[in-house]
Protein backbone atom coordinates (compact mmCIF):
# COMPACT_ATOMS: atom_id res chain seq x y z
CA UNK A 1 0.00 0.00 0.00
CA UNK A 2 1.41 3.33 -0.94
CA UNK A 3 2.24 5.98 1.62
CA UNK A 4 -0.27 8.27 -0.09
CA UNK A 5 -3.21 5.85 0.25
CA UNK A 6 -2.44 5.29 3.90
CA UNK A 7 -2.45 9.01 4.54
CA UNK A 8 -5.83 9.32 2.86
CA UNK A 9 -7.44 6.44 4.76
CA UNK A 10 -6.15 7.38 8.22
CA UNK A 11 -8.57 10.28 8.73
CA UNK A 12 -11.43 8.02 7.66
CA UNK A 13 -10.45 5.47 10.29
CA UNK A 14 -10.46 8.18 12.95
CA UNK A 15 -14.02 9.11 12.06
CA UNK A 16 -15.13 5.51 12.58
CA UNK A 17 -13.59 5.29 16.04
CA UNK A 18 -15.76 6.13 19.09
CA UNK A 19 -14.87 9.44 20.79
CA UNK A 20 -12.37 9.37 23.61
CA UNK A 21 -13.99 9.36 27.06
CA UNK A 22 -11.68 12.21 28.09
CA UNK A 23 -13.64 14.62 25.95
CA UNK A 24 -17.09 13.25 26.62
CA UNK A 25 -19.53 15.12 28.76
CA UNK A 26 -22.79 13.98 30.22
CA UNK A 27 -25.31 16.73 29.40
CA UNK A 28 -27.43 15.61 32.32
CA UNK A 29 -24.68 15.92 34.93
CA UNK A 30 -25.10 18.95 37.24
CA UNK A 31 -22.46 21.64 37.01
CA UNK A 32 -20.21 21.78 40.06
CA UNK A 33 -21.29 24.34 42.64
CA UNK A 34 -18.87 27.15 43.37
CA UNK A 35 -17.55 26.05 46.78
CA UNK A 36 -17.39 29.68 47.96
CA UNK A 37 -21.21 29.75 47.71
CA UNK A 38 -21.23 27.79 50.96
CA UNK A 39 -19.30 30.57 52.76
CA UNK A 40 -16.92 27.97 54.20
CA UNK A 41 -14.30 30.40 55.51
CA UNK A 42 -15.11 31.60 59.01
CA UNK A 43 -13.81 34.48 61.15
CA UNK A 44 -13.07 36.80 58.20
CA UNK A 45 -11.12 34.17 56.31
CA UNK A 46 -11.06 34.76 52.55
CA UNK A 47 -12.40 32.08 50.20
CA UNK A 48 -10.32 31.59 47.02
CA UNK A 49 -11.68 29.23 44.37
CA UNK A 50 -9.34 26.80 42.59
CA UNK A 51 -10.47 24.83 39.58
CA UNK A 52 -14.19 24.09 39.52
CA UNK A 53 -14.90 22.58 42.91
CA UNK A 54 -11.92 23.34 45.12
CA UNK A 55 -11.27 26.27 47.44
CA UNK A 56 -8.77 27.48 49.97
CA UNK A 57 -9.33 29.74 52.97
CA UNK A 58 -6.77 32.45 53.59
CA UNK A 59 -6.72 32.73 57.40
CA UNK A 60 -3.87 35.24 57.57
CA UNK A 61 -4.06 37.41 60.70
CA UNK A 62 -7.53 36.21 61.62
CA UNK A 63 -6.34 34.51 64.81
CA UNK A 64 -7.61 31.20 63.44
CA UNK A 65 -6.20 28.37 61.38
CA UNK A 66 -7.41 25.14 59.79
CA UNK A 67 -9.06 24.45 56.42
CA UNK A 68 -11.98 26.79 57.22
CA UNK A 69 -10.32 29.14 59.74
CA UNK A 70 -12.10 27.53 62.68
CA UNK A 71 -9.22 26.53 64.97
CA UNK A 72 -8.44 29.43 67.33
CA UNK A 73 -4.97 30.38 68.42
CA UNK A 74 -4.48 30.38 72.19
CA UNK A 75 -4.87 34.15 72.62
CA UNK A 76 -7.85 34.21 70.30
CA UNK A 77 -9.51 31.45 72.29
CA UNK A 78 -8.81 33.24 75.55
CA UNK A 79 -10.13 36.57 74.23
CA UNK A 80 -13.32 35.11 72.78
CA UNK A 81 -13.94 33.04 75.90
CA UNK A 82 -13.70 36.06 78.19
CA UNK A 83 -15.47 38.53 75.90
CA UNK A 84 -19.07 39.19 77.00
CA UNK A 85 -21.86 39.07 74.44
CA UNK A 86 -23.04 42.28 72.74
CA UNK A 87 -26.42 42.00 74.45
CA UNK A 88 -24.77 41.75 77.88
CA UNK A 89 -22.58 44.80 77.17
CA UNK A 90 -25.66 46.72 76.04
CA UNK A 91 -27.43 45.74 79.26
CA UNK A 92 -24.51 46.98 81.38
CA UNK A 93 -24.34 50.30 79.51
CA UNK A 94 -28.06 50.96 79.87
CA UNK A 95 -28.52 50.02 83.54
CA UNK A 96 -27.13 51.24 86.86
CA UNK A 97 -27.20 54.99 86.33
CA UNK A 98 -25.61 55.68 89.73
CA UNK A 99 -22.54 53.64 88.73
CA UNK A 100 -22.20 55.42 85.39
CA UNK A 101 -22.54 58.82 87.06
CA UNK A 102 -19.41 57.89 89.01
CA UNK A 103 -17.62 56.54 85.91
CA UNK A 104 -18.41 59.67 83.91
CA UNK A 105 -16.77 61.86 86.55
CA UNK A 106 -13.47 59.94 86.56
CA UNK A 107 -10.62 58.94 84.25
CA UNK A 108 -12.43 55.65 83.66
CA UNK A 109 -14.63 57.45 81.14
CA UNK A 110 -11.63 58.21 78.91
CA UNK A 111 -10.37 54.64 79.23
CA UNK A 112 -13.73 53.17 78.23
CA UNK A 113 -14.17 55.69 75.41
CA UNK A 114 -10.76 54.77 73.99
CA UNK A 115 -11.73 51.10 74.16
CA UNK A 116 -15.05 51.74 72.42
CA UNK A 117 -13.39 53.70 69.62
CA UNK A 118 -10.60 51.20 68.94
CA UNK A 119 -12.72 48.05 69.19
CA UNK A 120 -15.46 49.47 66.95
CA UNK A 121 -13.13 51.07 64.40
CA UNK A 122 -11.00 47.94 64.03
CA UNK A 123 -14.00 46.14 62.55
CA UNK A 124 -13.83 48.35 59.45
CA UNK A 125 -11.07 47.42 56.98
CA UNK A 126 -8.67 50.21 56.08
CA UNK A 127 -7.57 50.56 53.31
CA UNK A 128 -10.85 49.52 51.65
CA UNK A 129 -11.08 46.04 50.18
CA UNK A 130 -13.92 45.30 47.74
CA UNK A 131 -16.48 47.10 45.59
CA UNK A 132 -19.35 46.19 43.27
CA UNK A 133 -16.98 45.31 40.43
CA UNK A 134 -14.21 43.56 42.36
CA UNK A 135 -14.78 40.76 44.89
CA UNK A 136 -11.06 40.48 45.44
CA UNK A 137 -8.28 42.84 46.47
CA UNK A 138 -7.47 45.16 43.57
CA UNK A 139 -5.84 48.51 42.98
CA UNK A 140 -9.12 49.77 41.56
CA UNK A 141 -10.90 49.03 44.84
CA UNK A 142 -8.33 51.09 46.67
CA UNK A 143 -7.80 54.01 44.30
CA UNK A 144 -11.14 54.66 42.60
CA UNK A 145 -13.18 56.75 45.03
CA UNK A 146 -16.16 56.76 42.67
CA UNK A 147 -17.07 53.37 44.11
CA UNK A 148 -18.68 52.66 47.43
CA UNK A 149 -16.52 50.11 49.18
CA UNK A 150 -18.08 46.95 50.61
CA UNK A 151 -17.31 44.95 53.73
CA UNK A 152 -18.11 41.51 52.35
CA UNK A 153 -17.68 40.43 48.72
CA UNK A 154 -20.85 39.88 46.74
CA UNK A 155 -22.72 36.59 46.49
CA UNK A 156 -21.04 34.68 43.62
CA UNK A 157 -23.10 34.86 40.44
CA UNK A 158 -23.03 31.09 39.89
CA UNK A 159 -24.60 30.07 43.21
CA UNK A 160 -27.66 27.77 43.14
CA UNK A 161 -29.88 30.32 44.94
CA UNK A 162 -29.88 34.13 44.99
CA UNK A 163 -28.33 34.25 48.46
CA UNK A 164 -25.93 31.25 48.25
CA UNK A 165 -26.95 27.59 48.47
CA UNK A 166 -29.81 28.01 50.92
CA UNK A 167 -33.30 29.35 50.66
CA UNK A 168 -35.59 29.44 47.67
CA UNK A 169 -34.67 29.80 44.01
CA UNK A 170 -36.48 33.13 43.85
CA UNK A 171 -36.51 35.92 46.42
CA UNK A 172 -39.87 37.31 47.56
CA UNK A 173 -41.27 40.29 45.69
CA UNK A 174 -39.76 43.45 47.22
CA UNK A 175 -43.03 45.37 47.20
CA UNK A 176 -44.99 42.52 48.78
CA UNK A 177 -42.25 42.08 51.39
CA UNK A 178 -42.33 45.77 52.29
CA UNK A 179 -46.11 45.98 52.49
CA UNK A 180 -46.39 42.83 54.57
CA UNK A 181 -43.61 43.47 57.07
CA UNK A 182 -42.53 47.12 56.93
CA UNK A 183 -45.73 49.11 56.28
CA UNK A 184 -47.03 50.95 59.33
CA UNK A 185 -50.35 49.79 60.82
CA UNK A 186 -50.19 52.23 63.70
CA UNK A 187 -47.48 54.74 64.59
CA UNK A 188 -45.01 53.22 67.07
CA UNK A 189 -43.06 55.98 68.87
CA UNK A 190 -39.44 55.43 69.77
CA UNK A 191 -39.28 54.32 73.43
CA UNK A 192 -36.06 56.36 73.81
CA UNK A 193 -38.08 59.56 73.17
CA UNK A 194 -36.21 60.47 69.99
CA UNK A 195 -37.83 63.37 68.13
CA UNK A 196 -38.13 64.83 64.63
CA UNK A 197 -35.24 67.23 65.28
CA UNK A 198 -33.11 64.09 65.46
CA UNK A 199 -34.75 62.54 62.39
CA UNK A 200 -34.10 65.59 60.22
CA UNK A 201 -30.55 65.90 61.56
CA UNK A 202 -29.94 62.28 60.52
CA UNK A 203 -31.17 62.97 57.00
CA UNK A 204 -29.33 66.27 56.67
CA UNK A 205 -26.06 64.90 58.08
CA UNK A 206 -25.91 61.65 56.08
CA UNK A 207 -26.76 63.23 52.73
CA UNK A 208 -23.23 64.64 52.58
CA UNK A 209 -21.76 61.14 52.10
CA UNK A 210 -24.69 59.04 50.87
CA UNK A 211 -25.04 60.30 47.29
CA UNK A 212 -25.54 57.28 45.06
CA UNK A 213 -24.89 58.02 41.41
CA UNK A 214 -28.08 57.65 39.39
CA UNK A 215 -26.05 57.65 36.19
CA UNK A 216 -23.41 55.07 37.17
CA UNK A 217 -25.57 52.80 39.34
CA UNK A 218 -26.03 51.75 42.99
CA UNK A 219 -22.39 50.79 43.54
CA UNK A 220 -21.15 54.29 42.77
CA UNK A 221 -21.19 57.56 44.71
CA UNK A 222 -20.99 61.24 43.83
CA UNK A 223 -19.77 62.12 47.35
CA UNK A 224 -16.08 61.65 46.66
CA UNK A 225 -15.05 62.98 50.08
CA UNK A 226 -16.36 59.76 51.70
CA UNK A 227 -17.00 61.32 55.08
CA UNK A 228 -17.78 64.46 57.02
CA UNK A 229 -16.66 67.12 54.54
CA UNK A 230 -19.86 69.22 54.76
CA UNK A 231 -20.43 68.87 51.04
CA UNK A 232 -24.13 69.21 51.83
CA UNK A 233 -23.39 72.78 52.99
CA UNK A 234 -20.65 73.82 50.57
CA UNK A 235 -21.39 71.62 47.56
CA UNK A 236 -19.65 68.44 46.44
CA UNK A 237 -17.59 70.15 43.74
CA UNK A 238 -15.71 73.42 43.31
CA UNK A 239 -18.10 74.87 40.74
CA UNK A 240 -21.08 74.50 43.07
CA UNK A 241 -19.07 75.85 45.99
CA UNK A 242 -18.11 78.97 44.06
CA UNK A 243 -21.74 79.65 43.14
CA UNK A 244 -22.69 79.51 46.84
CA UNK A 245 -19.85 81.70 48.12
CA UNK A 246 -20.06 85.44 48.61
CA UNK A 247 -16.29 85.86 48.14
CA UNK A 248 -16.21 88.47 50.84
CA UNK A 249 -14.93 87.84 54.38
CA UNK A 250 -15.13 84.08 53.78
CA UNK A 251 -18.92 84.07 53.86
CA UNK A 252 -21.61 82.20 51.97
CA UNK A 253 -24.32 83.97 50.00
CA UNK A 254 -27.58 84.63 51.81
CA UNK A 255 -30.81 86.58 51.53
CA UNK A 256 -32.73 88.57 54.15
CA UNK A 257 -36.38 87.61 54.63
CA UNK A 258 -38.48 89.03 57.47
CA UNK A 259 -35.27 90.43 58.93
CA UNK A 260 -33.64 86.97 59.13
CA UNK A 261 -30.81 85.26 57.21
CA UNK A 262 -31.81 82.42 54.87
CA UNK A 263 -30.06 80.59 52.00
CA UNK A 264 -29.96 82.56 48.76
CA UNK A 265 -32.43 81.92 45.97
CA UNK A 266 -31.42 79.91 42.91
CA UNK A 267 -31.76 83.18 41.05
CA UNK A 268 -28.94 84.64 43.19
CA UNK A 269 -26.87 81.43 43.36
CA UNK A 270 -27.53 79.51 40.12
CA UNK A 271 -27.00 75.90 41.20
CA UNK A 272 -29.09 72.84 40.38
CA UNK A 273 -31.79 72.22 42.97
CA UNK A 274 -34.49 69.56 42.71
CA UNK A 275 -37.84 71.30 43.01
CA UNK A 276 -41.13 70.48 41.27
CA UNK A 277 -41.82 72.23 38.02
CA UNK A 278 -43.66 75.49 38.38
CA UNK A 279 -41.70 76.74 41.39
CA UNK A 280 -39.87 79.87 40.16
CA UNK A 281 -36.11 80.25 40.78
CA UNK A 282 -36.68 83.14 43.21
CA UNK A 283 -38.71 80.76 45.43
CA UNK A 284 -36.09 78.00 45.36
CA UNK A 285 -33.38 78.13 48.02
CA UNK A 286 -29.84 77.26 46.91
CA UNK A 287 -27.72 75.10 49.24
CA UNK A 288 -24.93 72.53 48.99
CA UNK A 289 -27.20 69.48 48.60
CA UNK A 290 -29.55 69.58 45.64
CA UNK A 291 -32.37 67.58 47.28
CA UNK A 292 -32.80 69.64 50.45
CA UNK A 293 -35.78 71.51 49.06
CA UNK A 294 -37.75 68.30 49.58
CA UNK A 295 -38.42 68.82 53.29
CA UNK A 296 -38.64 71.96 55.44
CA UNK A 297 -36.70 70.07 58.11
CA UNK A 298 -33.71 69.70 55.80
CA UNK A 299 -33.80 73.33 54.71
CA UNK A 300 -34.09 74.28 58.38
CA UNK A 301 -30.72 72.70 59.13
CA UNK A 302 -29.26 74.16 55.93
CA UNK A 303 -30.29 77.61 57.18
CA UNK A 304 -28.85 77.06 60.66
CA UNK A 305 -25.49 75.90 59.31
CA UNK A 306 -25.38 78.79 56.83
CA UNK A 307 -25.85 81.23 59.70
CA UNK A 308 -23.23 79.40 61.75
CA UNK A 309 -20.67 79.56 58.95
CA UNK A 310 -21.11 83.30 58.49
CA UNK A 311 -21.07 83.84 62.28
CA UNK A 312 -17.78 81.95 62.57
CA UNK A 313 -16.36 84.02 59.71
CA UNK A 314 -17.14 87.19 61.67
CA UNK A 315 -15.32 85.81 64.72
CA UNK A 316 -12.30 84.80 62.64
CA UNK A 317 -12.24 88.16 60.89
CA UNK A 318 -12.12 89.92 64.25
CA UNK A 319 -9.22 87.68 65.34
CA UNK A 320 -7.35 87.87 62.04
CA UNK A 321 -8.03 91.17 60.25
CA UNK A 322 -5.22 90.46 57.76
CA UNK A 323 -6.71 87.19 56.51
CA UNK A 324 -8.23 87.10 53.05
CA UNK A 325 -11.53 85.62 51.94
CA UNK A 326 -10.11 82.20 51.07
CA UNK A 327 -8.39 81.58 54.40
CA UNK A 328 -11.43 82.75 56.34
CA UNK A 329 -13.69 80.45 54.32
CA UNK A 330 -11.44 77.39 54.58
CA UNK A 331 -10.82 77.81 58.32
CA UNK A 332 -14.52 78.33 59.02
CA UNK A 333 -15.24 75.12 57.12
CA UNK A 334 -12.79 73.17 59.29
CA UNK A 335 -14.40 74.62 62.42
CA UNK A 336 -17.86 73.58 61.24
CA UNK A 337 -16.58 70.07 60.46
CA UNK A 338 -15.30 69.87 64.04
CA UNK A 339 -18.55 71.21 65.47
CA UNK A 340 -20.49 68.64 63.45
CA UNK A 341 -18.41 65.70 64.69
CA UNK A 342 -18.65 66.93 68.29
CA UNK A 343 -22.45 67.19 68.12
CA UNK A 344 -22.79 63.85 66.33
CA UNK A 345 -20.74 61.89 68.87
CA UNK A 346 -21.79 63.55 72.12
CA UNK A 347 -25.48 64.15 71.38
CA UNK A 348 -26.66 62.34 68.25
CA UNK A 349 -24.93 58.99 68.85
CA UNK A 350 -25.53 59.39 72.59
CA UNK A 351 -29.27 59.64 71.96
CA UNK A 352 -29.21 56.62 69.64
CA UNK A 353 -27.25 54.43 72.03
CA UNK A 354 -29.29 55.03 75.16
CA UNK A 355 -26.05 54.49 77.10
CA UNK A 356 -25.46 55.92 80.56
CA UNK A 357 -21.78 56.18 79.65
CA UNK A 358 -21.33 59.75 78.40
CA UNK A 359 -19.68 59.54 74.99
CA UNK A 360 -16.81 61.94 74.42
CA UNK A 361 -15.28 63.57 71.36
CA UNK A 362 -11.57 63.79 72.06
CA UNK A 363 -9.27 62.83 69.15
CA UNK A 364 -6.30 62.72 71.52
CA UNK A 365 -7.67 59.48 72.96
CA UNK A 366 -6.44 57.71 69.82
CA UNK A 367 -3.07 59.40 69.39
CA UNK A 368 -1.29 56.49 71.04
CA UNK A 369 -3.21 53.86 69.08
CA UNK A 370 -2.70 52.40 65.62
CA UNK A 371 -5.29 54.30 63.60
CA UNK A 372 -5.67 55.36 59.96
CA UNK A 373 -7.10 58.81 59.27
CA UNK A 374 -8.96 57.99 56.12
CA UNK A 375 -12.41 56.65 55.38
CA UNK A 376 -14.38 55.09 52.56
CA UNK A 377 -18.17 54.87 52.69
CA UNK A 378 -19.47 51.30 52.40
CA UNK A 379 -22.58 50.29 50.49
CA UNK A 380 -23.69 48.30 53.55
CA UNK A 381 -23.59 51.50 55.63
CA UNK A 382 -25.70 53.24 53.01
CA UNK A 383 -28.22 50.39 53.06
CA UNK A 384 -28.30 50.27 56.85
CA UNK A 385 -28.97 53.98 57.24
CA UNK A 386 -32.41 54.07 55.61
CA UNK A 387 -34.23 54.92 58.83
CA UNK A 388 -37.58 55.95 57.37
CA UNK A 389 -39.56 54.50 60.31
CA UNK A 390 -38.49 57.68 62.13
CA UNK A 391 -40.95 59.70 60.06
CA UNK A 392 -44.41 60.32 61.64
CA UNK A 393 -47.88 60.08 60.10
CA UNK A 394 -48.06 63.89 59.88
CA UNK A 395 -46.01 66.90 60.92
CA UNK A 396 -47.25 69.13 63.71
CA UNK A 397 -46.17 72.78 63.70
CA UNK A 398 -47.92 75.01 66.20
CA UNK A 399 -51.63 74.14 66.26
CA UNK A 400 -51.66 72.62 62.77
CA UNK A 401 -50.95 69.13 61.45
CA UNK A 402 -49.43 68.97 57.98
CA UNK A 403 -49.91 65.91 55.80
CA UNK A 404 -47.11 64.63 53.58
CA UNK A 405 -48.75 66.30 50.61
CA UNK A 406 -48.70 69.64 52.45
CA UNK A 407 -45.21 69.18 53.91
CA UNK A 408 -43.13 67.95 50.96
CA UNK A 409 -41.57 70.76 48.90
CA UNK A 410 -43.27 73.34 51.11
CA UNK A 411 -41.18 76.35 50.13
CA UNK A 412 -42.87 78.86 52.43
CA UNK A 413 -43.13 77.03 55.78
CA UNK A 414 -39.58 77.81 56.91
CA UNK A 415 -39.89 81.55 56.31
CA UNK A 416 -43.53 81.78 57.44
CA UNK A 417 -42.87 80.13 60.82
CA UNK A 418 -39.20 81.02 61.25
CA UNK A 419 -36.32 78.88 62.47
CA UNK A 420 -37.23 79.09 66.17
CA UNK A 421 -40.80 77.86 65.70
CA UNK A 422 -39.79 74.90 63.54
CA UNK A 423 -36.96 73.90 65.89
CA UNK A 424 -39.36 73.99 68.83
CA UNK A 425 -42.02 72.01 66.96
CA UNK A 426 -39.66 69.33 65.66
CA UNK A 427 -37.99 68.99 69.07
CA UNK A 428 -41.36 68.24 70.68
CA UNK A 429 -42.77 65.75 68.15
CA UNK A 430 -41.84 62.09 68.73
CA UNK A 431 -40.12 60.11 66.00
CA UNK A 432 -40.93 56.50 65.21
CA UNK A 433 -39.18 53.37 66.38
CA UNK A 434 -36.78 52.09 63.70
CA UNK A 435 -36.54 48.37 64.50
CA UNK A 436 -39.16 45.69 64.96
CA UNK A 437 -40.90 46.16 61.61
CA UNK A 438 -44.25 47.59 60.47
CA UNK A 439 -43.51 51.24 61.14
CA UNK A 440 -42.88 52.95 57.76
CA UNK A 441 -45.57 55.39 56.62
CA UNK A 442 -47.20 54.45 53.33
CA UNK A 443 -46.08 57.71 51.69
CA UNK A 444 -42.42 56.68 51.91
CA UNK A 445 -42.68 52.89 51.76
CA UNK A 446 -41.38 53.02 48.19
CA UNK A 447 -37.95 53.92 49.61
CA UNK A 448 -37.76 50.58 51.44
CA UNK A 449 -38.83 48.78 48.26
CA UNK A 450 -36.03 50.48 46.34
CA UNK A 451 -33.47 49.64 49.05
CA UNK A 452 -34.34 45.94 48.86
CA UNK A 453 -34.17 45.98 45.06
CA UNK A 454 -30.85 47.78 45.19
CA UNK A 455 -29.40 45.23 47.61
CA UNK A 456 -30.19 42.52 45.07
CA UNK A 457 -28.38 44.40 42.33
CA UNK A 458 -25.42 44.74 44.72
CA UNK A 459 -25.75 41.02 45.60
CA UNK A 460 -25.25 41.61 49.33
CA UNK A 461 -24.55 38.48 51.35
CA UNK A 462 -27.24 37.18 53.75
CA UNK A 463 -28.00 38.96 57.00
CA UNK A 464 -26.46 36.16 59.09
CA UNK A 465 -23.13 36.46 57.26
CA UNK A 466 -22.98 40.11 58.27
CA UNK A 467 -23.80 39.21 61.86
CA UNK A 468 -20.82 36.86 61.88
CA UNK A 469 -18.61 39.48 60.24
CA UNK A 470 -19.38 41.94 63.05
CA UNK A 471 -18.80 39.47 65.86
CA UNK A 472 -22.36 38.28 66.54
CA UNK A 473 -23.79 34.79 66.51
CA UNK A 474 -25.99 34.00 63.51
CA UNK A 475 -29.68 33.53 64.18
CA UNK A 476 -30.88 29.94 64.01
CA UNK A 477 -34.55 30.68 63.30
CA UNK A 478 -36.85 33.47 62.20
CA UNK A 479 -38.55 33.35 65.59
CA UNK A 480 -35.23 34.05 67.29
CA UNK A 481 -34.83 37.03 64.94
CA UNK A 482 -38.27 38.59 65.41
CA UNK A 483 -39.06 37.46 68.95
CA UNK A 484 -42.59 36.46 67.92
CA UNK A 485 -44.33 33.72 65.91
CA UNK A 486 -46.60 35.36 63.32
CA UNK A 487 -44.02 37.27 61.28
CA UNK A 488 -41.49 34.48 61.80
CA UNK A 489 -43.79 31.90 60.19
CA UNK A 490 -44.48 34.15 57.21
CA UNK A 491 -40.80 34.93 56.72
CA UNK A 492 -40.03 31.22 56.88
CA UNK A 493 -42.56 30.63 54.13
CA UNK A 494 -41.10 33.37 51.92
CA UNK A 495 -37.37 32.76 52.40
CA UNK A 496 -37.26 29.08 53.31
CA UNK A 497 -34.18 29.43 55.51
CA UNK A 498 -32.97 31.96 58.07
CA UNK A 499 -29.56 31.87 56.37
CA UNK A 500 -31.18 33.22 53.19
CA UNK A 501 -32.67 36.33 54.84
CA UNK A 502 -31.60 39.57 53.17
CA UNK A 503 -29.55 42.29 54.84
CA UNK A 504 -32.00 45.22 55.05
CA UNK A 505 -35.12 43.23 56.01
CA UNK A 506 -33.06 41.52 58.69
CA UNK A 507 -32.03 44.85 60.21
CA UNK A 508 -35.54 46.29 60.30
CA UNK A 509 -37.35 43.13 61.40
CA UNK A 510 -34.97 42.17 64.20
CA UNK A 511 -36.52 42.44 67.65
CA UNK A 512 -35.49 45.58 69.50
CA UNK A 513 -33.52 45.71 72.70
CA UNK A 514 -35.87 46.45 75.63
CA UNK A 515 -36.91 50.12 75.51
CA UNK A 516 -34.63 50.69 72.54
CA UNK A 517 -35.02 52.24 69.10
CA UNK A 518 -33.68 49.18 67.28
CA UNK A 519 -32.07 45.78 67.72
CA UNK A 520 -28.62 44.38 68.35
CA UNK A 521 -27.47 44.16 64.74
CA UNK A 522 -28.13 47.80 63.89
CA UNK A 523 -25.98 48.86 66.85
CA UNK A 524 -23.17 46.36 66.29
CA UNK A 525 -22.94 47.09 62.56
CA UNK A 526 -23.77 50.79 62.53
CA UNK A 527 -21.47 51.90 65.35
CA UNK A 528 -18.20 50.76 63.71
CA UNK A 529 -19.06 52.51 60.44
CA UNK A 530 -20.05 55.70 62.27
CA UNK A 531 -17.11 55.95 64.66
CA UNK A 532 -14.50 55.03 62.04
CA UNK A 533 -15.93 57.67 59.71
CA UNK A 534 -16.03 60.35 62.39
CA UNK A 535 -12.66 59.77 64.05
CA UNK A 536 -11.03 58.94 60.71
CA UNK A 537 -11.60 62.53 59.60
CA UNK A 538 -8.32 64.39 58.95
CA UNK A 539 -9.12 67.08 61.54
CA UNK A 540 -8.89 64.35 64.21
CA UNK A 541 -5.31 63.46 63.25
CA UNK A 542 -2.28 64.64 65.27
CA UNK A 543 -1.22 66.86 62.35
CA UNK A 544 -4.54 68.72 62.24
CA UNK A 545 -5.85 68.60 65.82
CA UNK A 546 -4.21 71.79 67.11
CA UNK A 547 -5.32 75.37 67.69
CA UNK A 548 -3.59 76.80 64.61
CA UNK A 549 -5.71 74.63 62.31
CA UNK A 550 -8.83 76.40 63.55
CA UNK A 551 -7.47 79.95 63.61
CA UNK A 552 -6.25 79.91 67.21
CA UNK A 553 -7.81 79.19 70.57
CA UNK A 554 -11.08 80.98 69.73
CA UNK A 555 -11.77 78.67 66.80
CA UNK A 556 -10.47 75.61 68.65
CA UNK A 557 -12.82 76.32 71.55
CA UNK A 558 -15.76 76.61 69.15
CA UNK A 559 -15.11 73.00 68.17
CA UNK A 560 -14.41 71.71 71.68
CA UNK A 561 -17.54 73.27 73.21
CA UNK A 562 -20.04 72.84 70.36
CA UNK A 563 -23.54 71.65 71.24
CA UNK A 564 -26.82 71.45 69.37
CA UNK A 565 -28.25 74.09 71.68
CA UNK A 566 -25.44 76.54 70.92
CA UNK A 567 -25.68 75.83 67.21
CA UNK A 568 -29.32 76.89 67.21
CA UNK A 569 -29.46 79.55 69.89
CA UNK A 570 -26.39 81.49 68.78
CA UNK A 571 -28.03 81.85 65.38
CA UNK A 572 -31.55 82.85 66.41
CA UNK A 573 -33.07 85.85 68.17
CA UNK A 574 -34.74 83.72 70.83
CA UNK A 575 -33.80 80.30 72.17
CA UNK A 576 -36.47 77.65 71.62
CA UNK A 577 -36.59 74.20 73.17
CA UNK A 578 -33.94 72.31 71.20
CA UNK A 579 -32.87 68.71 71.75
CA UNK A 580 -32.70 65.31 70.08
CA UNK A 581 -35.35 63.98 72.47
CA UNK A 582 -38.83 65.15 73.33
CA UNK A 583 -39.08 67.16 76.56
CA UNK A 584 -39.78 65.47 79.84
CA UNK A 585 -43.51 65.98 80.55
CA UNK A 586 -42.56 67.17 84.04
CA UNK A 587 -40.58 70.02 82.47
CA UNK A 588 -43.18 71.12 79.91
CA UNK A 589 -44.46 74.02 81.99
CA UNK A 590 -41.07 75.25 83.11
CA UNK A 591 -39.64 78.48 81.69
CA UNK A 592 -37.69 78.32 78.44
CA UNK A 593 -34.05 77.39 78.36
CA UNK A 594 -31.65 80.26 78.92
CA UNK A 595 -29.85 81.56 75.89
CA UNK A 596 -26.19 80.42 75.84
CA UNK A 597 -23.48 83.08 75.92
CA UNK A 598 -22.92 84.71 72.54
CA UNK A 599 -19.24 83.92 72.58
CA UNK A 600 -17.16 81.14 73.96
UniProtKB/Swiss-Prot annotation:
Protein EC: 1.14.99.1
Binding, heme b: 388
UniProt xrefs under InterPro entries: EGF-like_dom, Haem_peroxidase_animal, Haem_peroxidase_sf, Haem_peroxidase_sf_animal, Oxylipin_biosynth_metab
List of glycosylated residues: 68, 144, 410
Family note: Belongs to the prostaglandin G/H synthase family.
UniProt-annotated site: Aspirin-acetylated serine, residues: 530
Other known facts: The conversion of arachidonate to prostaglandin H2 is a 2 step reaction: a cyclooxygenase (COX) reaction which converts arachidonate to prostaglandin G2 (PGG2) and a peroxidase reaction in which PGG2 is reduced to prostaglandin H2 (PGH2). The cyclooxygenase reaction occurs in a hydrophobic channel in the core of the enzyme. The peroxidase reaction occurs at a heme-containing active site located near the protein surface. The nonsteroidal anti-inflammatory drugs (NSAIDs) binding site corresponds to the cyclooxygenase active site. Conversion of arachidonate to prostaglandin H2 is mediated by 2 different isozymes: the constitutive PTGS1 and the inducible PTGS2. PTGS1 is expressed constitutively and generally produces prostanoids acutely in response to hormonal stimuli to fine-tune physiological processes requiring instantaneous, continuous regulation (e.g. hemostasis). PTGS2 is inducible and typically produces prostanoids that mediate responses to physiological stresses such as infection and inflammation.
Co-factor binding comment: Binds 1 heme b (iron(II)-protoporphyrin IX) group per subunit.
Signal sequence bounds: 1-24
Activity regulation as described: The cyclooxygenase activity is inhibited by nonsteroidal anti-inflammatory drugs (NSAIDs) including ibuprofen, flurbiprofen, ketoprofen, naproxen, flurbiprofen, anirolac, fenclofenac and diclofenac.
GO molecular function: heme binding; metal ion binding; oxidoreductase activity, acting on single donors with incorporation of molecular oxygen, incorporation of two atoms of oxygen; peroxidase activity; prostaglandin-endoperoxide synthase activity; protein homodimerization activity
Name of the protein in its database record: Prostaglandin G/H synthase 1
Transmembrane segments: 74-82, 86-92, 97-105, 108-122
Topology in membrane: Multi-pass membrane protein
Superkingdom classification of source: Eukaryota
Example GO BP: prostaglandin biosynthetic process
Cystine connections: 36-47, 37-159, 41-57, 59-69, 569-575
Cofactor(s) it depends on: heme b
Keywords attached to this entry: Dioxygenase, Disulfide bond, EGF-like domain, Endoplasmic reticulum, Fatty acid biosynthesis, Fatty acid metabolism, Glycoprotein, Heme, Iron, Lipid biosynthesis, Lipid metabolism, Membrane, Metal-binding, Microsome, Oxidoreductase, Peroxidase, Prostaglandin biosynthesis, Prostaglandin metabolism, Signal, Transmembrane, Transmembrane helix
Pathway(s) it belongs to: Lipid metabolism; prostaglandin biosynthesis
Gene that encodes it: PTGS1
CDD domains attached to this UniProt entry: EGF_CA, prostaglandin_endoperoxide_synthase
Amino acid sequence: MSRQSISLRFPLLLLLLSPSPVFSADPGAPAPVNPCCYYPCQHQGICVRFGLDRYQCDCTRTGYSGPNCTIPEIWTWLRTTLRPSPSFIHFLLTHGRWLWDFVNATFIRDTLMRLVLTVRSNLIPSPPTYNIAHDYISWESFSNVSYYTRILPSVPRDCPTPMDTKGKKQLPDAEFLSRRFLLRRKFIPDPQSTNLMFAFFAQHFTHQFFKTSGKMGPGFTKALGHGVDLGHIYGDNLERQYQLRLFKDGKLKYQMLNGEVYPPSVEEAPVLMHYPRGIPPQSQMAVGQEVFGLLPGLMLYATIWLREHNRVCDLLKAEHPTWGDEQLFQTARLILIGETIKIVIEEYVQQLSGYFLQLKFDPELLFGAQFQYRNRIAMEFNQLYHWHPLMPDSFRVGPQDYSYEQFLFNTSMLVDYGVEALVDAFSRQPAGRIGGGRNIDHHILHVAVDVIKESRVLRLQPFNEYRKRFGMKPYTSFQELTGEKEMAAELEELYGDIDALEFYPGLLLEKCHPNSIFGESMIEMGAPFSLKGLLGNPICSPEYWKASTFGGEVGFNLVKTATLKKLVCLNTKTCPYVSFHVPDPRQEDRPGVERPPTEL
